[in-house]
From Swiss-Prot:
This is Nucleoside diphosphate kinase. The modification Phosphoserine is found at S122. Its cofactor is Mg(2+). GO terms for cellular component: cytoplasm.
């Protein structure tokens, strides 16, 4: 079954948005495979965002993402990688459609409340950064038969 990495960023944790964000994935019909509140080290943050190493905002991005705890999650279900990106909305919240997480809950491109893996390769890489294999729960929910 397909899995993706989703993370409530420090601004989302500070603004009490964990429940709101988790709820959207649950209501859509996805299954939570793993979750934890964790404060990223500079090294982990740089590894996670390594594709942006050369970008002018990299320092700011790493400093922001390590500024407080994040809520790290693995979500599972049919087409979840692409669907998570759709639920999250455009990178810049000012361009994100209403109804999406960023469209509803954020204003600033730097503080856009949530991260979601952008491809199957990224999902696999990012899940491995944050979770050990034994932390990934493999279970069925009865409600899955309705979605
Ligand atoms: P994320 O990785 O955090 O889920 O966001 P994303 O895929 O929608 O966007 P991405 O291109 O991967 O950028 C990663 C994060 O860098 C910050 N950013 N700032 N100042 C800027 O122009 C700028 N561009 C990107 C954003 O916080 C974005 O989420
Ligand atoms: Mg990205």
């Amino acid at each position: 079954m397909e899995r993706t990495y989703v993370m409530v960023k420090p601004d989302g944790v500070q603004r009490n948005l964990i429940g709101n964000i988790v709820s959207r994935f649950e209501q859509k019909g996805y299954t939570l495979a793993a979750a934890k509140l964790v404060t990223l080290s500079k090294e982990t943050a740089e590894t996670h965002y390594s594709e942006h190493r050369e970008r002018p905002f990299f320092g700011e991005l790493v400093s922001f993402i390590t500024s407080g705890p994040v809520f790290a999650m693995v979500w599972e279900g049919e087409g979840v990688i692409k669907a998570a990106r759709q639920l999250i909305g455009a990178t810049n919240p000012s361009e994100a459609a209403p109804g999406t997480i960023r469209g509803d809950l954020a204003v600033n491109v730097g503080m856009n409340v949530v991260h979601g893996s952008d491809s199957p390769e990224s999902a696999e890489r990012e899940i491995a950064i944050f979770f050990k294999e034994e932390e990934l729960n493999d279970y069925q929910k009865d409600s899955n038969k309705w979605v």
